[in-house]
Amino acid sequence: MSEDRLELLLELAKDDDPQARAMAVMGLAKISDPRGFAPTLVTLFDPVDEVRMAAATALGVFGDDRAFEALVQGISDPSARVQENCIWALGQIPTPRSFDKLIELVSNGGLPASGLEDAPEGAEATYSVANRATAATALGERASIAGSDLATSDECIERARIALLNAIDEYGGGDDELAALVSASVWTLGHLPADKQTTGVVLDLLEDEHEWVVRYSIEALAHFGDLAAIEPLEELAESEDEAIRELASQALEMLH
């Protein structure tokens, strides 16, 4: 990497053109020079949504724990896309507190999905279902990173599993918004080692009315390798839905 390129990107990060600033922080993350971290962090507070979105993604690429507080603050950003990118970035930071924050998000801060009405005394806010779904997905991506806590720590795996199963337990079917959280939770469970409880929960979701809940459930069951899934998957292999038929057939091939 040339010094000239670094200097150019550092200058562009302060450019009057928002698109230039956004491209600059992504460029700084790509070259991974430590000198690019601080300017990227500053741009997370840019007045333009597009720039903040890029900065959040870039900070995830850097994976530097010094961005933790700013990214947590970004979860309250006025832009939902910035919130989403900040949560994704937290999933890329390989430290215990970033993992803890993702668990907190998936778990709704320990509060019920219904909000404050049934919340413990002193509770002030809940996380949006969309952000909880993003956090659930971020856990799955984290589990795919070689050497990460979710790839190596039994304690972290169990904490994630409990949070994801509890999120699924809030779902009574029919709620489109919660279905997105369930889909994300099942997708991530498919990246974790299975146990009988998880397999049972996912098997029940094969009958859900939302296609993506069913799709990710099929994929997770194929990963789990539990032969209890064979019979229900054989039924889905006869589904009228072509995509479901193909997924179920592929899962059966993996289980046989």
Which stretches of residues belong to each language-model region?
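Short inter-helical turns and helix N-cap capping residues of alpha-solenoid HEAT/ARM repeat scaffolds
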Residues: 16-17, 47-48, 78-79, 109-110, ...
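Helix-start/N-cap signature of alpha-helical segments
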Residues: 124-131, 153, 174-181
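Eukaryotic acidic, Ser/Thr-rich intrinsically disordered low-complexity regions
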Residues: 234-256
